[in-house]
């Protein structure tokens, strides 16, 4: 099954790269993703996001126990009490700097499992432009999987 997924991703790499580039330049967006697109995104996210989590973790001194990639309906990411990060495959449709912001945000939850002042101070220490990135992230909306609506930027 993993070989088939990789072959599928490789066969659609040009489309994936094109979709990613269009998503990077678009700032105000509602993201509609079909189940088929979600599978492509999930595969690409595993290739891109998991290594990035560990790069940023090392850079800022965090040690996550694991990373999972899923299609989440309402969250860009989460961090469990077991020190595992879960990231939404739709992160692949965001600009890289926003993906990094979300990853760092979740990594900071490894030290503070809440959104208290100490948490936000740590996020700000890691990413001095965190407030700007947080505001920009609010212009993006996660949409549930929907067979009827495909975001025109992905076509």
Give the ranges of each region predicted by the language model.
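Walker B catalytic acidic pair
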Residues: 106
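Active-site-proximal or metal-binding-adjacent scaffold patches in catalytic folds
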Residues: 1-101, 110-155
């Amino acid at each position: 099954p993993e070989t088939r997924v990789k072959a599928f991703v490789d066969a659609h790499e040009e489309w994936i790269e094109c979709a990613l580039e269009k998503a990077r330049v678009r700032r105000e967006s509602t993201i509609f993703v079909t189940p088929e697109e979600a599978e492509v995104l999930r595969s690409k996210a595993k290739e891109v996001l998991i290594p990035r989590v560990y790069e940023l973790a090392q850079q800022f001194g965090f040690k996550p126990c694991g990373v999972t990639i899923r299609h989440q309906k309402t969250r860009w990411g989460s961090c469990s009490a077991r020190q595992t990060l879960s990231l939404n495959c739709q992160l692949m449709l965001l600009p890289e700097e926003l993906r990094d912001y979300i990853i760092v945000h979740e990594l900071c939850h490894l030290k503070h499992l809440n959104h208290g002042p100490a948490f936000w101070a740590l996020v700000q220490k890691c990413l001095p432009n965190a407030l700007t990135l947080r505001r920009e992230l609010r212009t993006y909306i996660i949409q549930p999987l929907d067979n009827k609506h495909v975001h025109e930027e992905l076509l």
